């Protein structure tokens, strides 16, 4: 039997017929309900001439319904709604390992679960070291930045300064709990420091050189910079002022995670926090039908105002 799959070509995404995958004894076959678009997927799309020959089936922020389980799988059963670590998931069905899924509480709509993306933020937040009363700045208020901001507020940050050049992102940051929000092109670091002083924790969530520089300006002595942004431009090369990092005696922490067991644990924690109402993704999500995948990627490439996270939904809206 075949299924619909989004395949990346030189001209963009095409919906093609491909075989429904066959699982082994330790895997699950899952009917896709929704899958988010990651900035990593967008990077591949924008540079597709370099990727289509070897990496043309994407999607790893998926949620769905378990259809079939391997003979060794006992933790979930057909009919369970899960969020998963899996690739590729821009398709009617995807396969995940039994260790790579988390069952969703009934109160969480799978369209907004985004378990893998939320897990990345939760893992980073577990390394913030936020204490009640800490003053925190977030540089970059896209989807990841604003989930991290909500997590820092839950952890007890007493004052949060959001920084982003896009007005819709600044407005959303304050809607979700930031105390103040600045455009870094209009309000320079000196002015922010004069108004609020230095920050105990600064989260870099933009993935660009200027964000690293701004974090260096804002962080206090013996403070922490947490790198959450995914640095892809210029082959990921960045420069830092090591003399200033040395003098300030700061901790610089890579917030990323690659170990599956740690990411699944963070995904489980994230779904619990979402269930309890401590974080929300819904205001950040724009839903597209699956066959609108090319439209979604073009909107993201254009930087459509108010578009934080595109989610492909398999059933028609």
Question: Residue ranges of each PLM-predicted region?
Answer:
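Glycine-rich beta-strand-centered segment in the early N-terminal region that forms part
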Residues: 21-35, 48-88, 105
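Glycine-rich phosphate-binding loop and adjacent beta-alpha segment
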Residues: 210-272, 276-278, 314-317
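C-terminal hydrophobic helical "lid"/dimerization subdomain
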Residues: 1, 213, 261, 265-317
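Mid-domain Rossmann-like dinucleotide-binding core that forms the NAD(H)/NADP(H) cofactor-binding site
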Residues: 111-186
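Short N-terminal strand-loop motif that marks the start
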Residues: 1-58, 315-317
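Short amphipathic alpha-helix with an adjacent loop that forms part of the alpha/beta core around
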Residues: 187-197
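A structural motif shared across PLP-dependent enzymes of the aminotransferase-like
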Residues: 86-99
């Amino acid at each position: 039997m075949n299924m619909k799959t989004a395949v990346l070509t030189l001209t963009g995404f095409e919906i093609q017929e491909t075989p429904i995958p066959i699982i082994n004894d330790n895997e699950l076959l899952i009917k896709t309900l929704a899958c988010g678009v990651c900035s990593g997927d967008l990077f591949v799309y924008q540079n597709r001439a370099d990727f289509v020959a070897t990496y043309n089936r994407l999607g790893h922020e998926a949620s769905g319904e378990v259809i079939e389980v391997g003979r060794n799988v006992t933790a979930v059963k057909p009919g369970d709604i899960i969020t998963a670590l899996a690739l590729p998931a821009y398709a009617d069905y995807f396969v995940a390992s039994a260790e790579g899924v988390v069952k969703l509480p009934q109160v969480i709509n799978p369209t907004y679960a985004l378990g893998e993306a939320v897990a990345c933020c939760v893992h980073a937040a577990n390394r913030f070291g936020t204490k009640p009363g800490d003053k925190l700045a977030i540089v970059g208020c896209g989807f990841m930045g604003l989930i991290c901001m909500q997590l820092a507020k839950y952890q007890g940050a007493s004052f949060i300064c959001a920084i982003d050049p896009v007005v819709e992102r600044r407005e959303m940051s304050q809607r979700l709990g930031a105390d103040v929000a600045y455009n870094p092109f209009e309000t320079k670091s000196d002015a922010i420091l004069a108004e609020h002083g230095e920050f105990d924790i600064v989260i870099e969530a933009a993935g660009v050189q200027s964000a690293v520089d701004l974090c260096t300006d804002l962080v206090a002595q013996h403070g922490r910079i947490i790198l959450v942004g995914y640095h892809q431009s210029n082959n990921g090369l960045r420069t830092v002022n090591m003399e200033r990092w040395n003098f300030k005696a700061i901790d610089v922490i890579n917030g990323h995670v690659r170990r599956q067991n740690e990411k699944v644990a963070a995904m489980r924690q994230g779904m619990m926090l979402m269930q309890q109402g401590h974080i929300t993704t819904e205001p950040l999500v724009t839903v597209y039908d699956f066959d609108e995948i090319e439209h979604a990627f073009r909107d993201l490439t254009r930087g459509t105002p108010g578009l934080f996270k595109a989610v492909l939904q398999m059933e028609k809206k």
